[in-house]
Design a protein with these regions (language model features):
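Basic/polar N-terminal segments that are highly enriched at the extreme N-terminus
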Residues: 1-2, 21-30
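Residue-level micro-sites within transmembrane alpha helices that shape
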Residues: 6, 137-139
Length: 170
């Protein structure tokens, strides 16, 4: 079981490191289309302070986890003063007898004005194999990688040796 946990963490970290250079997932691969859909949807939500879109993004991601087979009681959207947090538990079999691991990311971005950008900051644009838009790297890419990774592992029937907890803040 240690090997599968190590493999999961290694692959997740590898994806995050490689994706910081260029996000060019083959959308024809299994889960590639779903990952791209989540990425595009999240970049195109203006989750800046005062825009009240973080709760919308949290609810969208919660619905993806529900569709992906995560029990409703393990998915929590916590709305607080115009923003939100999302907490998702991936239940393990406790074969490792260890405490849960928390994986965190943030759903919000610093606001951007259209006139300050060459492109609309809240429209995902691909040019020459690179994606442009507010949050494409920090941190909607990481959030998408974790989300898509959990969805894929769940679909493949993988059960972690301990609980894994997603904690996305707004």
């Amino acid at each position: 079981m240690f090997n599968s946990m190590f493999k999961f963490l290694f692959v997740t970290l590898l994806l995050l490191v490689l994706s910081s250079y260029s996000f060019s997932a083959d959308i024809n691969m299994p889960f590639g289309q779903k990952a791209f859909e989540i990425y595009k949807t999240s970049v195109e939500m203006r989750t800046a302070e005062g825009q009240h879109q973080v709760p919308t993004l949290a609810r969208y991601l919660a619905s993806e986890f529900k569709k992906g087979g995560f029990p409703e009681e393990d998915i929590h959207v916590l709305e607080i003063e115009g923003t939100a947090a999302l907490v998702v538990r991936y239940r393990g079999d406790d074969s490792l007898g260890k405490k849960p691991i928390s994986i965190s990311a943030h759903m919000d971005v610093v606001d951007a004005l259209r006139e300050d950008w060459e492109r609309d900051p809240f429209t995902l644009v691909e040019e020459n194999g690179y994606y442009f838009g507010r949050g494409t790297v920090d941190n909607k890419l990481g959030m998408t990688a974790v989300t898509a990774g959990f969805l894929r592992l769940k679909a493949e029937g993988w059960v972690p040796g301990r609980d894994l907890i997603i904690a996305f803040s707004g």
